[in-house]
Curated annotation (Swiss-Prot):
Protein name: Beta-glucosidase A
Pfam families noted in UniProt: Fn3-like, Glyco_hydro_3, Glyco_hydro_3_C
Record keywords: Carbohydrate metabolism, Cellulose degradation, Glycosidase, Hydrolase, Polysaccharide degradation
Native species: Butyrivibrio fibrisolvens
SMART domains attached to this UniProt entry: Fn3_like
InterPro entries in the cross-refs: Cellulose_deg_GH3 (IPR050288), Fn3-like (IPR026891), Glyco_hydro_3_AS (IPR019800), Glyco_hydro_3_C (IPR002772), Glyco_hydro_3_C_sf (IPR036881), Glyco_hydro_3_N (IPR001764), Glyco_hydro_3_N_sf (IPR036962), Glycoside_hydrolase_SF (IPR017853)
Length: 830
């Protein structure tokens, strides 16, 4: 009853020990800092300049020293009690180092002035560095630290040089500000930043760079420069990102992060760059399954374009990997139930001994890759199949690391019928396995898995088939033409549209229902004879869900299929809100970096590191702990659902929302996010993986068509969601705005019912993204349970009158959401 009572009274009561709040508590803030330390990646450390030795005098340069970006904008933003920048982090250790003060004051005053003008963090122009300050700093110190920061956010994509046309987006002020600052696009240094870096290099023998960014940026300027000694990819580290970076720079923490993306030499080296801003109305995913390292490790000539490979990251200590082993593993008979083919071995178990042969404690990440035969389908040269992070190993200490890979997880999808149409299959031939510490630093294991025939792992049916994608890339770098079909008119509707309907945001038309304050007190009134059945009786198994729904009128059912008004501290609306039958208005909250509450409410929460950083921890335990902590804050602030994690793929560095997402690799993204879901739901808070699916571009996000092959969709863009659904049974799934192969995702029966529910067994509630362009009645038919931020009750009732909908369609959608809410106290826990 605790959950229900909290919904009834909407309190903000402390849940911590001794009556203390958990929201933005010191414990959670320390966890945020710990997670940030775990995911920051040391890219370069020539001459072992890092860690900075005790007694060193340092000078700080770059507006990023104070212009610290804790995370991206939009749903990923968080209202926090404070933010600790790099200078403030280093200032905690003045007993270890001395900091030159004049450059500090210069940047502090400059950044403060820019903030007062209303310029967003990360969007401030680099100021000209006064020569007298530089000369004085060089006389004071021989070690310089340069900080570079970047910002991006929801509703707009990163700037790229050479695109002069106006791009449709929802944050024109930020785009215009970026146009003023970034001479070559924000992937590269600005001219002002280049000048500052050049001046610093000319005056200091040791130069350290700290990158405070949310996504992939140019690394060529420091990789090939011997004058830059060390580089820390600090990402966007949340509330304590500056302190976390300081701890690593000073050796208080040994870095153990590994890249979750490939860092190429140039933006143009990513195949997705070409065509990203070609048109606002569509994006062709012509690189197909060759995304990230799958491209750079496979396509001829692409390897040489990589500066830092996927999985790469340095440490202050040295690890020795030895005694590599690999062997087949056959599960027990109980585990074999449901296997699709008796000829399919269950798994390979790979293991290696990791020893810290250095002088300080540290952690290492062991990564297992596999290589499948090219066959008729074509495959990437390597694919991540498993990983494990060691515990903190003391000097001389060893740990045996074991990783299992199920053979069926190596299956490829045949969309065109080259082997067996619409089937997940393993092609005959040899499968090889590699174990190491990055996609490049691996050893071929002495075990080969050989198939003498093709094995069908799962037979499904074609879904989300493209109609307008002209071609796709093959493993040799050439392209094959794809069949073109006549697109279906998915914009057809039984209702008249305004002439400018594509430009009309629905919440300008739809009216959010008003909550009567006194209705809240009807939720838990004792039932009287003749009263309607109450929802709490369903949760208590006194009334069947079918009987409860059967008593509802069409109007009541239609109302429940739309989002409900904000109450309490919410700003992203609620689910439910039918008090006459005891259905509460359970509130939702953003977002991927922490519980987002509007500043005017006066409640601050913990800002955790951006999801890209969390992916770079390669540590499911830390993601689980962040999920637990965030779930506790959501619960204490009386939210029923947390709209996280966001698990779209880093297809292109240009996506403005990559900071919310984990990786270019769906397996890594899925496993890390699944751990977070497990943590969230241990609090009986509904986790909501989003944005389902192919949300890889923010420009014109409500009207852009993502055109991809069915194989790429299934193997790359849906795989992380599939892992989460099958491993952690999330209570909800949030859709995306865009169109997929000509059909709006919220209206796609293939996506919502065919794949999500029928193939994967999803049993939660599906919600649209807020204020999308989908027709509500078509969303109901497709399998969308709740239209957010509010529904269109009148349209649903009219659709029933026009025979476009049946009452049973509404009942089906309501049964999905009611089952989710009534079972919310039984969600998977730790």
């Amino acid at each position: 009853m605790e959950k229900w009572a909290r919904i009834k009274y909407t309190p903000n009561l402390p849940l911590g020990e001794n009556g203390e709040r958990v929201t933005a508590s010191q414990k959670h803030i320390e966890l945020s800092c710990e997670a940030a330390c775990e995911g920051m990646v040391l890219l370069k450390n020539d001459r072992n300049v890092l860690p900075i030795r005790k007694g060193t005098r340092v000078a700080l340069f770059g507006k990023g020293v104070f212009d610290y970006v804790k995370g991206g904008g939009g749903s990923g933003d968080v209202t926090v009690p404070y933010i600790r920048n790099l200078y403030e982090g280093l200032s905690q250790y003045t007993s270890d180092i001395s900091i030159y003060d004049k450059s500090v004051r210069f940047y502090q005053e400059y950044v403060a002035d820019q903030y007062r003008l209303g310029i967003a963090p990360g969007m401030i122009k680099e100021p000209a560095l006064p020569e007298d300050i530089l000369a004085d700093a060089a006389a004071y110190a021989d070690t310089a630290i340069i900080a570079i920061s970047r910002f991006s956010g929801e509703g707009w994509d990163r700037k790229v040089a050479g695109v002069d046309r106006e791009i449709k987006c929802e944050a024109k002020d930020l785009v215009e500000q970026g146009n003023k600052i970034f001479d070559h696009g924000d992937f590269y240094l600005t001219n002002a930043e280049k000048k500052m870096v050049k001046m610093v290099k000319e005056n200091f023998s040791s130069v350290i760079v700290v990158m405070n960014v949310g996504g992939v940026v140019d690394t060529t300027w420091f990789k090939k420069d011997d004058q830059i000694s060390s580089v820390l990819m600090a990402w966007q580290g949340g509330i304590e990102g500056g302190l976390a970076a300081a701890r690593i720079l000073l050796g208080k923490v040994n870095p153990s992060g590994k890249l979750s993306d490939t860092f190429a030499a140039r933006l143009e080296d990513y195949p997705s760059t070409e065509g990203f801003h070609e048109d606002d109305d569509y994006v062709d995913y012509t690189e197909d399954i060759y995304v990230g390292y799958r491209y750079f490790e496979t396509i001829p000539g692409a390897k040489e374009k990589v500066n830092y490979p996927f999985g790469y990251g340095l440490s202050y200590t040295t690890f020795l990997l030895e005694d590599y082993k690999a062997e087949p593993f056959v599960a027990s008979a109980a585990d074999e139930v449901g296997k699709s083919d008796s000829d399919l071995a269950d798994a390979i178990v790979a293991s290696v001994t990791v020893t810290n042969i250095g002088k300080i404690p540290g952690k290492e990440v062991v990564q297992l890759y596999y290589s499948a035969p090219q066959g008729k389908l074509g495959k990437p040269a390597k694919v991540l199949g498993g990983y494990a992070k060691t515990r903190l190993l003391q000097p001389g200490e060893s740990q045996r690391v074991t990783i299992a890979l199920y053979m069926e997880d190596m299956a490829s999808y045949d969309d065109l019928g080259k082997v067996k149409k619409a089937a997940w299959l393993l092609e005959k031939g040899e499968y090889h396995f590699f174990l190491g510490t990055s996609v490049r630093d691996t050893r071929l294991l002495d075990y080969t898995y050989e198939l003498s025939k093709n094995i069908i792992v799962e037979q499904v049916s074609n879904k989300l088939v493209p109609t307008s994608l002209p071609k796709r890339m093959l493993a040799d770098g050439t392209y094959e033409e794809l069949p073109q079909t006549e697109p279906v008119d998915t914009y057809a509707t039984i209702f008249p549209r305004p002439k400018n309907w594509k430009e009309t945001i629905e919440h300008d038309v739809l009216k959010t229902p008003v909550v009567r304050p006194q209705d809240r007190f009807q939720l838990f009134l004792p039932p009287k004879e003749g009263d309607p059945k109450k929802f709490i009786e369903v949760a208590e198994c006194k009334v069947t869900l079918e009987d409860f729904i059967a008593q509802l009128s069409n109007e009541q059912l239609a109302s429940l299929l739309g989002g409900q008004p904000n109450v309490g501290m919410a700003n992203t609306f609620g689910y439910g809100n039918l008090p006459e039958v005891g259905v509460p208005n359970a509130q939702t909250c953003d977002g991927p970096a922490g519980v987002r509450i509007a500043p005017e409410v006066g409640v601050v929460t913990t800002a955790f590191p951006c999801s890209t950083l969390l992916a770079c921890t390669w540590n499911e335990d830390i993601c689980y702990e962040v999920g637990v902590a965030g779930g506790e804050e959501a619960k204490e602030c009386n939210f029923g659902a947390w709209l996280t994690p966001a698990v779209n793929i880093h297809r292109s560095p240009l996506c403005g929302r990559n900071f919310e997402y984990y990786s270019e690799d769906p397996f890594l993204a899925g496993k890390q996010a699944a751990a977070m879901v497990r943590g969230i739901q241990s609090n009986n808070i509904i986790a909501t993986p989003k944005h389902f699916a192919l949300n890889n571009k923010e420009s014109n996000r409500k009207g852009s068509d993502s055109r991809a092959s069915e194989r790429a969709i299934r193997e790359i863009y849906l795989k992380a969601f599939e892992i989460i659904v099958k491993e952690q049974s999330p209570g909800a799934s949030c859709l995306q705005y865009n169109i997929v192969n000509g059909q709006r995702s919220s209206e796609s029966h293939d996506l919502l019912t065919g794949i999500l529910r029928d193939e994967w067994g999803f049993e939660g509630v599906v919600v649209s993204d807020w204020w999308g362009f989908g027709e509500h009645y078509k969303e109901v038919l497709a399998g969308n349970d709740i239209k957010m931020g509010c529904g269109y009750t009148e349209q649903l009732l009219e659709a029933i009158d026009k025979k476009a909908l049946k009452r049973k369609d509404l009942e089906k959608r309501q049964s999905e959401s009611s089952r989710c809410f009534s079972n919310s106290t039984k969600l998977k826990a730790a």
